[in-house]
Amino acid sequence: MAVCIIDHDNIRGVIYFEPVHGKDKVLGSVIGLKSGTYSLIIHRYGDISRGCDSIGSPEIFIGNIFVNRYGVAYVYLDTDVNISTIIGKALSISKNDQRLACGVIGISYINEKIIHFLTINENGV
C-alpha cells in the first residue's frame, strides 16, 4: 500500500493506493480546490523542494476527480499502476496542464483501517 499527503497552499488531502478485492484502487479525499474536474498524475521525481516545479515530467495519468461546490473531492478510482513502481515519485493535482498541488508517494504501513472521508454539509461546514 502507498500513500500521498497533499498539503500545498490551501489544498490538502490524502490519497491511498491499495488493492481492494484483487484490483488496485486510488482512494482518498482532497479539499481546497474550486468546483470542477481535475487530473491526478504521477510524475517522474518525488522532489518537492521547489514545490510542484521540481517533480519532473508527467508519467502516468491516474484519472480525473470532481470537486463539488464545497471544494471537496472524494477519490475512488481503478488503476492499473503497479504500486511498487510509484513509491518515491510525486502525485500532482492538475488542471489544464497547471500543477496546483503535489506530494510524494510513500510506503504506507499495511494494517486494517477505515478511511474516513471529510464531509461537508449544504452550508459548507
Swiss-Prot record:
One of its GO terms (biological process) is superoxide metabolic process. It is found in: Virion; Host cytoplasm. One of its GO terms (cellular component) is host cell cytoplasm. It comes from the Viruses. One of its GO terms (molecular function) is metal ion binding. The keyword Protein transport does not apply. The keyword Repeat does not apply. Disulfide bonds join C52-C102. InterPro entries: SOD-like_Cu/Zn_dom_sf. Keywords: Disulfide bond, Host cytoplasm, Virion. Superoxide dismutase-like protein with no enzymatic activity. Belongs to the Cu-Zn superoxide dismutase family. This is Cu-Zn superoxide dismutase-like protein OPG175. It comes from Vaccinia virus (strain Dairen I).
